[in-house]
Amino acid sequence: MIPYRSRTSTHGRNMAGARGLWRATGMTDSDFGKPIIAVVNSFTQFVPGHVHLKDLGQLVAREIEAAGGVAKEFNTIAVDDGIAMGHDGMLYSLPSREIIADSVEYMVNAHCADAMVCISNCDKITPGMMMAAMRLDIPVVFVSGGPMEAGKVNIDGELRAVDLIDAMIEAANPDRTDAEVDEFEKNACPTCGSCSGMFTANSMNCLAEALGLALPGNGSTLATHADREALFRRAGRRIVELTKAYYEGGDTGVSARGIATKAAFENAITLDIAMGGSTNTILHLLAMAREGEVDFTLADIDRLSRVTPCLCKVAPAVQNVHMEDVHRAGGIFGILGELGRAGKLDTSVRTIHEDTMAEALSKWDIAVTNNPEVQELFLAAPGGVRTTQAFSQARRYKDLDTDREKGVIRSAKHAFSKDGGLAVLFGNIAEMGCVVKTAGVDDSILKFSGPAVICESQEEACERILKKRVKAGDVVIIRYEGPRGGPGMQEMLYPTSYLKAMQLGKECALITDGRFSGGTSGLSIGHVSPEAAEGGAIGLLHEGDIIEIDIPNRTINAKVSAEEFAKRRAEMDAKGAAAWKPVEERPRKVSRALKVYAAHVGNASLGAVRLDP
């Protein structure tokens, strides 16, 4: 038996004062022997993925208390990357992940909570909470707010499914009228929930299922659908069972690290590669593993990327497939089932809901189960009504998408490609690696060579693209945008969207030590490590240097000799205080908080986590 953490503050004569304070929160004598479970919410009216979470914490809390626990809710911050995009607000997005992780750790440890339910949804909130869970290593259940419904726009006589990225691209398209852009804007984000494609938020909530830390349906059941309520209720009941198993039964295998082992991380990245998830997920998985002392590195991701097929393509990789379509095809367990049959998963790992992944697949993979409740779950469809309310509709599809040859989810035999949707590249400008979402790269440019167009900020890149100073065949280099150099490792969604708008999406490459939105597609290579600000070779490139990209062979190099690089490095170092900084000072406000972040953060190959002093 493992002592309950909460008894530190609820038992013993010396804790009379603490108990007095607990009583002031509503606890009574009968509560002091029960587990105290933190309900970690992230409600905010700033973010559509979180606007509907206000009452859901108390929904979970009631289930916890009905099952024999004491629930205590608190909130953490949530940044909307789409609203923060394209201005200095984006400097705060990635650093907010560390603030979220710290705040959860601080609250849970300060109050000696025994376990937690994490109610997350959008880009940095899920990974931030997961980092905290890995630090704390207590029982945890993740339940997200769910995906947004895809928007619908009638363009050129055709009804198209659209999302936030379409609005951004069309706004920069000179061929679109103001009225057409307005139509995209008003319909791109029709409901509450995380943006509807396989962007970072949805990618992370899907990976939570593969890690074993979330219930089936977590990543794909729409925020608006009535079926999602059952996930929240079940999460509240299940955390009490896990907590008692851990403390009273001594089962350490149900803690966060007990579930999220190295094998589970490998399952998660295998899913990520198979579904062409956001490149940000690589950053977050590396960070989570580091916080949990799991030996999972970029080398593991590189190894698995070479042998994992691409089984699912979702927006932004393709136009008309969104999370609601993945759900109809069986959701994440539909993809995991195909990976399992292909021998690409370790099905012996535990999950929060079954003793092994094999058992979970037998129950939740629509290709093998006849359970009508499971089939009913994956028939949950979009309602098509603008709303900010959770569980506000109960519409259902007439049938499931079980076509594994040409459907949304493919079998390994009928894969979109034999190697998957994410790749790690190495070379003389990325000695510690960089990443690319291959699911969004046209086959014609998997090998690409062209002259470098050097930009020392995202703003400079946007200006050059919009002023048509980037032409077909160019390789746009955006540097000094890494975790330290930005600081904050901004997402480069606007430059990639503008390349598309200028009809250069299949004609140019973009390389950066920054990162990309989950909405990015095209030959967009990010996370270049080491970054320019720490002496990376990307900082030594000159305008016109020929850059060679070879995704099939996982290489990225500048046609610059080692001797020339050494000469350039010596010249850079000789600049003293001006070395490894943009040539011209950028009009960028860097607060004290961001300076502190920059002083301690590691590069992307390490997950951009803070390094120990």
Curated annotation (Swiss-Prot):
Annotated pathway: Amino-acid biosynthesis; L-isoleucine biosynthesis; L-isoleucine from 2-oxobutanoate: step 3/4; Amino-acid biosynthesis; L-valine biosynthesis; L-valine from pyruvate: step 3/4
Binding site for [2Fe-2S] cluster: C122, C195
Primary enzyme class: lyase
Required co-factors: [2Fe-2S] cluster; Mg(2+)
Details of cofactor binding: Binds 1 [2Fe-2S] cluster per subunit. This cluster acts as a Lewis acid cofactor.
Binding site for Mg(2+): D81, D123, K124, E491
One Gene Ontology term from the biological process aspect of the record: L-valine biosynthetic process
Catalytic activity: (2R)-2,3-dihydroxy-3-methylbutanoate = 3-methyl-2-oxobutanoate + H2O; (2R,3R)-2,3-dihydroxy-3-methylpentanoate = (S)-3-methyl-2-oxopentanoate + H2O
Swiss-Prot/TrEMBL keywords: 2Fe-2S, Amino-acid biosynthesis, Branched-chain amino acid biosynthesis, Iron, Iron-sulfur, Lyase, Magnesium, Metal-binding
Gene3D superfamilies with a match to the protein in the record: IlvD/EDD C-terminal domain-like (3.50.30.80)
Database matches in PROSITE patterns: ILVD_EDD_1 (PS00886), ILVD_EDD_2 (PS00887)
One GO MF term: dihydroxy-acid dehydratase activity
Any coiled-coil regions, as ranges: none
Modification N6-carboxylysine, positions: K124
Pfam family, one: ILVD_EDD_N
Top-level taxonomic group: Bacteria
EC number: 4.2.1.9
List of catalytic residues: S517 (proton acceptor)
Subunit: Homodimer.
Family to which this protein belongs: Belongs to the IlvD/Edd family.
PANTHER family according to UniProt: D-XYLONATE DEHYDRATASE, D-XYLONATE DEHYDRATASE YAGF-RELATED
Function: Functions in the biosynthesis of branched-chain amino acids. Catalyzes the dehydration of (2R,3R)-2,3-dihydroxy-3-methylpentanoate (2,3-dihydroxy-3-methylvalerate) into 2-oxo-3-methylpentanoate (2-oxo-3-methylvalerate) and of (2R)-2,3-dihydroxy-3-methylbutanoate (2,3-dihydroxyisovalerate) into 2-oxo-3-methylbutanoate (2-oxoisovalerate), the penultimate precursor to L-isoleucine and L-valine, respectively.
Protein name stated in the entry: Dihydroxy-acid dehydratase
The organism of origin for this protein: Hyphomonas neptunium (strain ATCC 15444)
Gene name linked to the record: ilvD
